[in-house]
Amino acid sequence: MAASAIQSSAFAGQTALKQRDELVRKVGVSDGRFSMRRTVKAVPQSIWYGADRPKFLGPFSEQTPSYLTGEFPGDYGWDTAGLSADPETFAKNRELEVIHSRWAMLGALGCIFPELLSKNGVQFGEAVWFKAGAQIFSEGGLDYLGNPNLVHAQSILAIWATQVVLMGLIEGYRVGGGPLGEGLDPLYPGGAFDPLGLADDPEAFAELKVKEIKNGRLAMFSMFGFFVQAIVTGKGPIENLADHIADPVANNAWAFATNFVPGK
């Protein structure tokens, strides 16, 4: 009787351990706390992923490196300099690219939209992106959207300190995995950051990742172009575009490059 009870107890213990291990395997565990994770396919069934994805090898690469397998969005198999050969460096660079892509998309919109509004009769102070911030050095200071009732800034140091604090909090929140370090993906956290549920379908989510990184790369090049335009022409992107349309021969990259004199 005692032997039967011991055997039953041992069997029950093994069953409980198996159930616990299965639960941990399904939902994950971090620092002694269980955290739910969305289950997704390892390689999405999309033309943009896998060995048969579209590739661009560039002029100096004969074949796709073995470490670029098409697992991640935006992988066209091009890495002539071998920047992604080390897995840790690759992971870090992917994170930096996605974050900078998002900032560039927001920045490009911020460079274009105020100038468009100004061209259509909306008055809110300086519309050219690289001139707007300089208003803080004027006697009247800087009014956000031209409205002194919103944010009236007169100290560049105060703006800098506020920026550091706010961005530090946001970046800490992201790197920490969400509120109280709940184990959210630092690049694609979902949840409250996806109120429309765009990532609920894994296949649609995989496609959106590709669209995001492609548009983000384009935005980074656009921002670089805006910087160069500001230095060379002293005008915003919309005004430069209007000048080019009005007189393409006199207003183009080649004409400005051949006539550009630094400091003038």
Curated annotation (Swiss-Prot):
GO molecular function annotations of the record: chlorophyll binding; metal ion binding
Binding site for chlorophyll b 1: 56
Binding site for chlorophyll b 4: 163, 174
Single GO biological process annotation from the record: photosynthesis, light harvesting
Binding site for chlorophyll a 3: 135, 145, 212
UniProt-recorded name of the protein: Chlorophyll a-b binding protein of LHCII type I, chloroplastic
Cofactor: record remark: Binds at least 14 chlorophylls (8 Chl-a and 6 Chl-b) and carotenoids such as lutein and neoxanthin.
Segments traversing the membrane: 98-118, 150-170, 218-238
Annotated localization: Plastid, Chloroplast thylakoid membrane
Domain notes: The N-terminus of the protein extends into the stroma where it is involved with adhesion of granal membranes and post-translational modifications; both are believed to mediate the distribution of excitation energy between photosystems I and II.
Positions bound to chlorophyll a 2: 100
Record PTM Phosphothreonine, positions in chain: 39
Assembly with partners or alone: The LHC complex consists of chlorophyll a-b binding proteins.
GO cellular component: chloroplast thylakoid membrane; photosystem I; photosystem II
Gene3D superfamilies per UniProt: Chlorophyll a/b binding protein domain
Residues bound to chlorophyll a 1: 78, 84, 97, 217
Topological category with respect to the lipid bilayer: Multi-pass membrane protein
Top-level taxonomic group: Eukaryota
Family matches, as SUPFAM superfamilies: Chlorophyll a-b binding protein (SSF103511)
Protein family according to the UniProt entry: Belongs to the light-harvesting chlorophyll a/b-binding (LHC) protein family.
Modified residues (N2-acetylarginine): 37
UniProt binding sites for chlorophyll a 4: 215
PTM remark: Photoregulated by reversible phosphorylation of its threonine residues.
UniProt-annotated binding residues for chlorophyll a 5: 211, 229
